[in-house]
């Protein structure tokens, strides 16, 4: 449904006067109103998660990424697998180590509201410019985030083009769904992240925009709250969304899915007979 998701927020760039170096510098206001000075148009950019890498590659060439996450190279989890196939070093699932940071010495770090505060403080204390985005947990927030990122990397016009294309695709999807006039269905996300998927998540916004009822919301559970087995049974969805098979199951998503579907209580539900596999990138990326 909407591959265009992650990207933009209102920020301003102010040219700084002075010597040659300062003439290249500019100030960006990030999602949390931090005024961040960027010494020059960055060439070695480090994102702190796969979603940020995806947004970055909407506005810069792959050569400007200083590193990428291992998950970026998995086509089942990432939209940018082909673009980052030659990028090194690769950041493991457990995050950015000091060794990697020192090795690549980025001239810009783009972090999110999910980044731990102690890491943000450390990076700033070492002199790295850190620009933060918020979430994103909604389409509107994604558009704001991409505008922040685009300004931070010195590509404001590219950011506006990405947002315009997102809006075009969303309108096209809305028009197609409206013409089909399908009866409402209720879907339940089967996920290891047992607190993910309710109202307040990107998944919920996209699902409901597609005209599908979210079973998590139907039983009163919000994003960040636990969905118990009792509530799963109570939700009585029309179908389950599950993780599709991948070549490797390093995250354990396939094992979790199989265990879930082997539960007798789940097998007695009508949704057990309508299991829809989705690549993880359509759920989490």
Which residue ranges define each predicted feature?
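Extracytoplasmic ligand-binding site segments that recognize negatively charged/polar headgroups
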Residues: 76, 116-120, 134-148, 182-206, ...
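Short helices/loops that flank or line small-molecule/ion binding pockets
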Residues: 95-105, 125-126, 227-236
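Bacterial N-terminal signal peptides
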Residues: 1-9
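Alpha-helical, coiled-coil/dimerization segments enriched in small aliphatic residues
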Residues: 198-224
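Bacterial Sec-exported substrate-binding components of ABC uptake systems
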Residues: 10-54, 157-187
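A short, structured surface patch at a secondary-structure boundary
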Residues: 47-102, 108-113, 215
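Short helix-initiation/N-cap motifs at beta->coil->alpha
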Residues: 31-33, 87-99, 136, 220-229
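Structured C-terminal subdomain patch of bacterial secreted/periplasmic proteins
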Residues: 13, 146-153, 160, 164, ...
